[in-house]
Each structure stands twice: as C-alpha cells, then as structure tokens.
Amino acid sequence: MRRQSQRGFTLLEIMVVIVIMGILASLVVPNLMGNKDKADRQKVVSDIVALESALDMYKLDNSRYPTTEQGLQALITKPSVPPEARYYPQDGYIRRLPQDPWGGDYQLVSPGQHGQIDIFSSGQDGVPGTDDDIGNWTLSKK
C-alpha cells in the first residue's frame, strides 16, 4: 500500500500569513482614513463654493443676500419672510440643498461675522462654533 502524502498548511505557516496581513493592514488603514478626511473636507469646500455662487446670483437679482432667518432655503423656494425677493426664478437658484458629509445642514449667517455672508458646516461633531467647523472664511487656511 502506498501512503498518501497529506497536503495543507501547517499552523506555523497560517500564523505567519496572519501576522503579515496584520502588518499590511496597520500600514494601509491609517492611509485610507486620512484620505477619507481629505475627501470629506473637499466635498464641504465644493458645496460651499457652489452655495456661494448661487447666493451671488440671488444678490444680483435682488441687490442683497438672503437674511439669516431666510437661510439657504431661499435658494430653492422664494422667501416668505421679509424682505421679499423682487425677482425669483421659477425653479429657484438650485434644485436642492446639499448636506455635509456628516449628514448636517449647511448654515448661512447674513450679514456674516467674517464677511458679507458666512456659509459653514458644523463639522463632524455637528456643533457650531467648535474647531472642526468649516466655513467660507476658512477655505484658504487649511
């Protein structure tokens, strides 16, 4: 009778592969997390630039920006709160308001504390006035 040789991996070989995979994961995961943060910030920057452009169109039509009370909603529906818009396009200035990457709404302060208007995301923590806020006044700083 012929003895069949068993094929397979030894426990030591499996452990070596697991250790190598762990080392690779420890190198790759931090890089992926950093890229996610950069991508989230870039989305906020793009959204704020788009909102600024829409607000500039609103100002061209109405000689002023929407008030804080009217908010960014004034870009998709005609404000019902005074001062009323003199001219308002049938479809508004944008189709919908974007949300920041963390599911929060962008905020408008008009007149702003940093310029004519302040547009900002409350950041990952969702709390306005904290260090992670990203606003149109911080775009060139970070």
UniProtKB/Swiss-Prot annotation:
Transmembrane segments: 9-29
Entry's Gene Ontology cellular component terms: plasma membrane; type II protein secretion system complex
Principal subcellular localisation of the protein: membrane
Record-stated family: Belongs to the GSP G family.
Pfam families reported in the protein's UniProt record: N_methyl (PF07963), T2SSG (PF08334)
Record's keyword annotation contains 4Fe-4S: no
Cell location: Cell inner membrane
Organism: Klebsiella michiganensis (strain ATCC 8724 / DSM 4798 / JCM 20051 / NBRC 3318 / NRRL B-199 / KCTC 1686 / BUCSAV 143 / CCM 1901)
Highest taxon above the source species: Bacteria
Membrane topology category: Single-pass membrane protein
UniProt cross-references to NCBIfam families, sorted A to Z: IV_pilin_GFxxxE, typeII_sec_gspG
Taxonomic lineage of the native organism: Bacteria, Pseudomonadati, Pseudomonadota, Gammaproteobacteria, Enterobacterales
Modified how: Cleaved by the prepilin peptidase. Methylated by prepilin peptidase at the amino group of the N-terminal phenylalanine once the leader sequence is cleaved.
Name the record gives this protein: Type II secretion system core protein G
Function per UniProt: Core component of the type II secretion system required for the energy-dependent secretion of extracellular factors such as proteases and toxins from the periplasm. Pseudopilin (pilin-like) protein that polymerizes to form the pseudopilus. Further polymerization triggers pseudopilus growth.
Residue positions where N-methylphenylalanine is found in the record: 9
Disordered: annotated span: 122-142
The keyword Cell inner membrane appears for this protein: yes
Residue numbers covered by the propeptide annotation in the UniProt entry: 1-8
Any one GO BP annotation for this protein: protein secretion by the type II secretion system
Subunit record text: Type II secretion system is composed of four main components: the outer membrane complex, the inner membrane complex, the cytoplasmic secretion ATPase and the periplasm-spanning pseudopilus. Forms homomultimers.
Alphabetical UniProt keywords: Cell inner membrane, Cell membrane, Membrane, Methylation, Transmembrane, Transmembrane helix
